[in-house]
Amino acid sequence: GLNMENWKKDSRKDIVMVDVDALVPPDHLLRKVERVMDYDWLYERLSPYYCADNGRPGTDPVVLIKMVLIQHLFGIASLRQTHREIQVNIAYRWFLGYSLLDEIPHFATVSYAFCKRFPPELSEEIFAHILNKALNNRMVDPSMIFIDGTHIKASANKKKLQKEQVAKAAKVYEEQLRKEVSEERKKLGKKVNDDDDDENKGSSGGGTVEKTVSKTDPDCGMFVKGAHERQFAYEAHTACDKHGFVLGVEVTAGNVSDSAAWDAVYDQVTNSFPEVKFVTMDAGYKTPWIAKKVLEHSRIPILPYTRYKGKKDKFKPWDFIYDAATDSFTCPRGHELRHTTTSKEGKRTYRSSPKICKDCPCRTVCGANESGQRILTTHIWQEYLDLVEHLRKTERGKELYAMRKETIERVFADAKEKHAMRYTHHRGLARVSAWVRLKYAAMNLKKIAIWKWNASNFASYIMIFAPFNDKTPVLVV
């Protein structure tokens, strides 16, 4: 029957003899992680930063790195909170190799080690080591990559700002575009711009532009989130494979466009994985330069449909037929638009004759200007965008673009919902970049650990039940 006295029994001060290992569930995530991680390389890498025969005894550097891994694996917002969680969590203590009574290293010790003692490139090395572990286990398929960017809210008050005049940033492809434009202008008999060799001028003509700068964290950028919402942020431009393994990341200020930061992350991934065949991106990357660069590298860019932004009741650009032999367009009424000039931004201009257009019955729907002239502009690298449009309509193109939601978008969703990447407490581009890389390293490590755990369990299942079923396939783990 019911015994109320048993319910009131207080066992909180009972003395129990038990080892920490027995208290951690056999399928706990940290057990899975511990099975796949190796730390010898970390001791070897960090040994020059510690003195063996002088000074006070230091904290084990691997313990400090494990504390940061715990923070990112379980989405704990800060190191201070991580320290509190480890104090009372038996599994966390087990992962660090500590008993129930051992004192946990102070969070300031961890922070100081990463800021002052450890080498700045340690986060990149940890990320690369974990990614190599996935490659060695043949878990990564770099033949197709997915690139996108996500914003991370900065630790900066959006009301504490100032306006600054900064030089326009030169584009990566500026020199190549300038050469091609100069050659084309010479063929057209046009003057080559005198400022082409001015190193102080950007691709849009040089000069400066006004920029909103945070007084708290000057490295972040003002990101326009919606019609009325603005905030300081960073952006993590990320590349992953079809399984969701992060292959590379480049962190920039939040006001840097996707296409401007694309070259850094693309070069980073393709240098590490030359076997990349398909590159899938969203509309923010649909530019002539990106299409040209990917296609010239014998890779296939997969980009989405973008809606035409002109007037609905006017002739569309595709209503005009291009003749490569004469380098001209023909309008729906059969009249010619001649190539007149090419701007230094790479825009070709085709113009019709005002004498013909003046009396044309289609003038109202043609889109001609007030002087009765129809002007059509295309980019000097338009042929690459046209090929991208063709690839988009193929079955393979539709299939790969649909995979974005379960690959790169899933990476961002998990990073923000499960691993606390929605906002950062760090300030400065270098510290935020290291923070993002460690977070992605933890996500890759989690995937490796779970996959290997599931594979070993499945192999055990096969070994037990194979004698009873001759048709059971053999799994090599």
Give the residues covered by each predicted segment.
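Anion-binding and metal-coordination hotspots
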Residues: 6-7, 75-88, 100-477
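Short amphipathic alpha-helical interface patches used for protein-protein assembly/oligomerization
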Residues: 92-96
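A short, ordered amphipathic alpha-helix with a cationic face
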Residues: 7-10, 56-58, 98-100
